[in-house]
């Protein structure tokens, strides 16, 4: 059994501060194979991500995936890396800073399920600052066991090590939150006003294996519900938008339709002008900037497409920060 973590030199009456912790997936520390490998290892050894027996999965992971994938992934990260660091880390930090500015009576931090800043390190910092109440917000509007579930797992792992445990609240999902929907609507309308509008809007969400859905993961249904609400807010007809799922890997069957498949099919169906937005990603990252903005464009044009626009994620959009503040205030309740 692991020992309890040391408690800070604070009396119990001093451990009464409230904090908001924004949680995102994670990123390697640098766009190099050496940095990507430990990140992938921590990610792909989580039972929330790969639901296979260790005896079956670990030989594949260590013998193939961690041998060949880091170099390929590092090359992809190089294409989208900012001077300040990983886009996901940069934008998530900006969201936390904006939230802190709007809620100055609280401590606001961000942490990653995998990589840095780690949930363990940030919770230790908050404990030392006298935080006794924590609102953890996984930055995934649609709940999936492999995203929101994994993030909350990491928080709970640290609670198991605390002798004097924090009080913790989490927000498991907000796929139908009015502020979130309104922020996306305004963001897309502004983009269209500035850059023009295609014939169809693709709403691309991260995929999950079909088996996860069959076993009770509500994620695909929540994605489709979000898409419906957003389409209604934008006053789109059913012919003017489509919903798809991206980022599949491995040989298992994933939920459909596949974003990558549609890049090849839509031009052949007469859709040669396409806009793509990813409602489930609240910060631009590898899956949006490289997979959709760069590779998706190539796939669409190779299939005969003529005009392709990637609409960036909400990132630190002021409307999204407004929605995030409202979401936090609603769930903090009497803690403020």
UniProtKB/Swiss-Prot annotation:
Keywords of this entry: Cytoplasm, Heme biosynthesis, Iron, Lyase, Metal-binding, Porphyrin biosynthesis
UniProt-recorded name of the protein: Ferrochelatase
EC nos: 4.98.1.1
Gene Ontology biological process terms from the UniProt entry: heme biosynthetic process
Pathway noted in the entry: Porphyrin-containing compound metabolism; protoheme biosynthesis; protoheme from protoporphyrin-IX: step 1/1
NCBIfam families: hemH
Protein location: Cytoplasm
Keyword flag Transcription: no
């Amino acid at each position: 059994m692991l020992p309890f973590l040391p408690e800070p030199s604070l009396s119990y009456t001093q451990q009464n501060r409230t904090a908001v912790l924004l949680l995102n997936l994670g990123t390697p520390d640098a766009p190099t194979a050496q940095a990507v490998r430990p990140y992938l290892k921590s990610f792909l050894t989580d039972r929330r991500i790969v639901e296979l027996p260790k005896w079956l999965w670990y030989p594949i992971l260590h013998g193939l995936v961690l041998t060949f994938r880091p170099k390929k992934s590092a090359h992809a990260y190089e294409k989208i890396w900012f001077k300040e660091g990983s886009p996901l880390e940069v934008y998530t930090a900006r969201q936390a800073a904006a939230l802190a500015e709007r809620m100055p009576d609280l401590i606001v931090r961000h942490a990653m399920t995998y990589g840095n800043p780690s949930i363990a390190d940030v919770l230790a910092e908050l404990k030392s600052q006298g935080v006794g109440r924590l609102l953890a917000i996984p930055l995934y509007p649609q709940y999936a066991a492999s995203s929101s579930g994994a993030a909350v797992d990491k928080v709970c792992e640290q609670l198991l090590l605390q002798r004097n445990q924090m009080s913790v609240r989490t927000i498991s999902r907000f796929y139908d939150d009015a502020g979130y929907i309104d922020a996306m609507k305004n963001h897309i309308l502004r983009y269209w006003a500035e850059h023009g509008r295609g014939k169809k809007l693709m709403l691309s969400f991260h995929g999950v294996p079909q088996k996860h859905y069959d076993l009770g993961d509500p994620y695909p249904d929540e994605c489709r519900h979000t898409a419906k609400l957003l389409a209604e807010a934008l006053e789109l007809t059913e012919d003017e938008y489509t919903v798809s799922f991206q980022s599949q890997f491995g040989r298992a069957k994933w939920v459909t339709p596949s974003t990558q498949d549609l890049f090849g099919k839509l031009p052949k169906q007469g859709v040669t002008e396409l806009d793509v937005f990813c409602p489930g990603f609240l910060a631009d990252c590898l899956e949006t900037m490289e997979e959709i903005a760069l590779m998706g464009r190539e796939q669409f044009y190779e299939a005969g497409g003529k005009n392709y626009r990637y609409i960036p994620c909400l990132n630190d959009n002021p409307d999204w920060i407004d929605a995030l503040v409202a979401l936090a205030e609603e769930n903090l309740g009497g803690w403020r």
